[in-house]
């Protein structure tokens, strides 16, 4: 999942340089969603490790 987040992050950076429209705008939204999901999963895993 981190691999996909990095790929879409790079696409989002390119989209920012070229302008947010069409596929570029969609890639930016996907990158944002993957970032939030990965961040939430990382926080959950940090808290769960402490209780094991």
Swiss-Prot record:
It is found in: Cell membrane. It comes from the Bacteria. Pfam families: DUF1328. Keywords: Cell membrane, Membrane, Transmembrane, Transmembrane helix. GO terms for cellular component: plasma membrane. It is a multi-pass membrane protein. The chain crosses the membrane at residues 5-25, 27-47. Signal peptide: none annotated. HAMAP family: UPF0391 (MF_01361). Belongs to the UPF0391 family. This is UPF0391 membrane protein XCC0220.
């Amino acid at each position: 999942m981190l691999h996909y987040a990095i790929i879409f992050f790079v696409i989002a950076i390119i989209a920012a340089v070229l302008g947010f429209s069409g596929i570029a705008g969609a890639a930016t939204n996907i990158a944002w969603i993957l970032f939030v999901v990965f961040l939430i999963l990382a926080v959950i895993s940090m808290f769960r490790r402490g209780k094991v």
